[in-house]
C-alpha cells in the first residue's frame, strides 16, 4: 500500500501558495484494509476514508469509464491493481495531476510541473471532454490563477468550445453551475470566469441573459467602454474590490452581474439609450436567479439593485418622497447592513466604466445621511400621539419625509 499527497495541495505547494486542504491517494489497498486500520468510510459515489486522527481524506486509486451523459455518467474501478498513473490521468488538468510521497518525492507523469512553470492550464487527455463540469472548473481556475499569469492552453480552449457546441453542458444541474459560480466569486478575479465562458460559447448556454448584453451599446459619455456586456464585467471586477466590506459578498457579486440585464431588452431604435432598463431588468434577473436556484436572499438583493441602482446615482436630485420609497423598498429599517451592501453595489456600477475606476461616490454618504436622520424618527412617539394600525405607517412615513426635507437644502 502506497500513500500519496495529490491534487491542489501539491500544486499550491509548488506555486508557493498556502495549502488549505490536503487530499491523499491510496494505491494498492482495499476498503477492508483501511477500515481495519481505523479509517472511517464516507461518501456514496466512491470510497473516501477519513484518517482516524487527522480526519484528512484518503481516496482509493480508481479508473473511470464513461457509460452515460453528464458528470455522473461513469463506471469506476477501485481495485488494488489501479496504478498511480492510471488514477492521475483521469484528472482534469496537468497541474492537478501531480503526486508526492511521504519522502517528498514528486511524481509528475503528465508534465504538470512544466505547465506550472509556463503558467498553462492544459487538459491531460481527450477524456476531459467526458465531464462537462470540467468546463466550469477550468474557467474558475483561470479566474483563481489570473493574477499569477495563468492562461488556458489553446488546445484546451478548443476542446471546451467543442464540448459546448455538442450540447454537453445541458447535462449540468443548476446546483452545480451555481456552486462553481459561487467559487468563482470567491477568487480575486471573478470576471475572468465569465470571460472564459463567453470565449467558449458557454455564457450563452448557462447565462443567456448576461450574454445578450454583449454588443449592446451605451452612451459613450457615461460609458467610455460602450459595450453593455463589457461594462458588466467591469462592474463585477469593481464589486470584488469592494466585497471585503460587504456582509454578503456573494449577493454583491450576483447583483453586479444582474444589475443591467434590462439593457439586453432595449428596443434597437432608441439605442444607445436605455430608458426604463431598471424595471425591465427585474424579470430577467428573477428568471436567471430562479433557473440557477440561487438562494432567496441573494436573488432578492440582486432584484433590488437592478430596480433601484440608478436612483442611488441620482440621490442628490431625488425628492424626499422618492428617497423614502427606495428606503422602504430596501427595508433598511430592519436590514441596515443590506442597505450598506446596496450602496456598495451602486458604487461598483459607477466605477465599472473605463477611466472611472477610482472615482469618488459621494451618493453613498448622502444616502447614509438621509438614512440617519430618517431613522431617528421614533415610532413609539407616533403611537403615543394616538395613531393606530395603518395610520402609524402613514404618519411614520410623513415624519421621515419631513426629516429628509429639513436637511436636503444643505446638500
UniProtKB/Swiss-Prot annotation:
One of its GO terms (biological process) is tRNA 3'-terminal CCA addition. Its EC number is 2.7.7.72, 3.1.3.-, 3.1.4.-. Mg(2+) binds at residues 21, 23. Its cofactor is Mg(2+); Ni(2+). Magnesium is required for nucleotidyltransferase activity. GO terms for molecular function: ATP binding; CCA tRNA nucleotidyltransferase activity; cyclic-nucleotide phosphodiesterase activity; magnesium ion binding; phosphatase activity; tRNA binding. Residues 228-333 form the HD domain. InterPro entries: CCA_bact, HD/PDEase_dom, HD_domain, HDIG_dom, NT_sf, PolA_pol_head_dom, PolyA_RNA-bd, tRNA_CCA-adding_enzyme. ATP binds at residues 8, 11, 91, 137, 140. Disulfide bonds: none annotated. Keywords: ATP-binding, Hydrolase, Magnesium, Metal-binding, Multifunctional enzyme, Nickel, Nucleotide-binding, Nucleotidyltransferase, RNA repair, RNA-binding, Transferase, tRNA processing. CTP binds at residues 8, 11, 91, 137, 140. It catalyses: a tRNA precursor + 2 CTP + ATP = a tRNA with a 3' CCA end + 3 diphosphate; a tRNA with a 3' CCA end + 2 CTP + ATP = a tRNA with a 3' CCACCA end + 3 diphosphate. The keyword RNA-binding applies. A single active site specifically recognizes both ATP and CTP and is responsible for their addition. Comprises two domains: an N-terminal domain containing the nucleotidyltransferase activity and a C-terminal HD domain associated with both phosphodiesterase and phosphatase activities. Monomer. Can also form homodimers and oligomers. Catalyzes the addition and repair of the essential 3'-terminal CCA sequence in tRNAs without using a nucleic acid template. Adds these three nucleotides in the order of C, C, and A to the tRNA nucleotide-73, using CTP and ATP as substrates and producing inorganic pyrophosphate. tRNA 3'-terminal CCA addition is required both for tRNA processing and repair. Also involved in tRNA surveillance by mediating tandem CCA addition to generate a CCACCA at the 3' terminus of unstable tRNAs. While stable tRNAs receive only 3'-terminal CCA, unstable tRNAs are marked with CCACCA and rapidly degraded. Belongs to the tRNA nucleotidyltransferase/poly(A) polymerase family. Bacterial CCA-adding enzyme type 1 subfamily. HAMAP family: CCA_bact_type1, CCA_bact_type2. This is Multifunctional CCA protein.
Amino acid at each position: 500500500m502506497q500513500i500519496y499527497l495529490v491534487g491542489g495541495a501539491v500544486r499550491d505547494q509548488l506555486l508557493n501558495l498556502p495549502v488549505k486542504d490536503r487530499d491523499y491517494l491510496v494505491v494498492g489497498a482495499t476498503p477492508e484494509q483501511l477500515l481495519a486500520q481505523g479509517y472511517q468510510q464516507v461518501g456514496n459515489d466512491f470510497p473516501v476514508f477519513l484518517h482516524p486522527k487527522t480526519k484528512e481524506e484518503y481516496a482509493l486509486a480508481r479508473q473511470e469509464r464513461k457509460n452515460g451523459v453528464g458528470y455522473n455518467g461513469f463506471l469506476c474501478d477501485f481495485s488494488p491493481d489501479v496504478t498511480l498513473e492510471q488514477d492521475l490521468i483521469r484528472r482534469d488538468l496537468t497541474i492537478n495531476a501531480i503526486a508526492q510521497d511521504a519522502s517528498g518525492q514528486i511524481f509528475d507523469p503528465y508534465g504538470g510541473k512544466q505547465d506550472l512553470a509556463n503558467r498553462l492550464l492544459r487538459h491531460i487527455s481527450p477524456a476531459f471532454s467526458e465531464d462537462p463540469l470540467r468546463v466550469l472548473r477550468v474557467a474558475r481556475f483561470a479566474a483563481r490563477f489570473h493574477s499569477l499569469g495563468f492562461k488556458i492552453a489553446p488546445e484546451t480552449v478548443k476542446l471546451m468550445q467543442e464540448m459546448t457546441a455538442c450540447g454537453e453542458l445541458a447535462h449540468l444541474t443548476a446546483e452545480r453551475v451555481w456552486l462553481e459560480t459561487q467559487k468563482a466569486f470567491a477568487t480575486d478575479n471573478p470576471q475572468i470566469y465569465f470571460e472564459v465562458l463567453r470565449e467558449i460559447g458557454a455564457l450563452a448556454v448557462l447565462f443567456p441573459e448576461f450574454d445578450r448584453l454583449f454588443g449592446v451599446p451605451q452612451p459613450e459619455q457615461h460609458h467610455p467602454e460602450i459595450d453593455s456586456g463589457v461594462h458588466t464585467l467591469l462592474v463585477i471586477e469593481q464589486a470584488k474590490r469592494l466585497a471585503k466590506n460587504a456582509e454578503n459578498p456573494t449577493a454583491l457579486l450576483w447583483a453586479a452581474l444582474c444589475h443591467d440585464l434590462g439593457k439586453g431588452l432595449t428596443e434597437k431604435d432608441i439605442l444607445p439609450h436605455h430608458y426604463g432598463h431598471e424595471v425591465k431588468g427585474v424579470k430577467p434577473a428573477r428568471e436567471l436567479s430562479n433557473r440557477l436556484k440561487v438562494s432567496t436572499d441573494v436573488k432578492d438583493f440582486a432584484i433590488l439593485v437592478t430596480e433601484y441602482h440608478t436612483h442611488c446615482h441620482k440621490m442628490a436630485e431625488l425628492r424626499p418622497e422618492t428617497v423614502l420609497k427606495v428606503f422602504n423598498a430596501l427595508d433598511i429599517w430592519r436590514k441596515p447592513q443590506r442597505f450598506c451592501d446596496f450602496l456598495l453595489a451602486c458604487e461598483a456600477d459607477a466605477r465599472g466604466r473605463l477611466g472611472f475606476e477610482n472615482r469618488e461616490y459621494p451618493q453613498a454618504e448622502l444616502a447614509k445621511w438621509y438614512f440617519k436622520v430618517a431613522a431617528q424618527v421614533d415610532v413609539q412617539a407616533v403611537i403615543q400621539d394616538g395613531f393606530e394600525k395603518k395610520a402609524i405607517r402613514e404618519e411614520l412615513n410623513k415624519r421621515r419625509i419631513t426629516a429628509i426635507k429639513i436637511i436636503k437644502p444643505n446638500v
